[in-house]
Amino acid sequence: MKAIIAMAQNRVIGKKNGLPWPSIKEDFKWFKEFTMGKTLIVGKNTFDTLPLLKNRECLVLTKQVEAIDAYITNQYLVNNNAMTGQMITMEDIESYSQFRKDYLIVVGGAKTYVKLLPYITEFYVTHVNGNYDGDTFMPEFEHLFAHQEVVKEFDGHKVVKYSK
């Protein structure tokens, strides 16, 4: 499976359930292009902050099914290995990723990235130019990937593809 993230030089990825840096229009455009038509895996806190993502299916990882069950429509809910209306496990996600690896993308937050890091074969990281104050950080992961390649550059920021 793949993952996509934006990260400041000091590894900050969030602040108060949002992005700590000013809006980067080109990065939002890149995110939309990269995720369009795909199945996204997202943690509940991150899911709560996202706008409606048209033409994308979401698998929401949470321990609090009742907190979001009421307003999920046309989305699947993964609740500690149980999907609403259907059982699903982390093994199911791993199996699903083997068959649909080009269609399954982890989009955050930090706990979700860490939990699914063993399954991620390609990690697309927008390296945001600068250091920012934040309360959510991405731990080091680069050592898990053998290759890295700059795939996009805009406004002083670089998108690097890390692959195994």
Regions found by a protein language model. Name each.
Residues 1-164:
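Enzymes that bind and transform nitrogen-containing heteroaromatic metabolites
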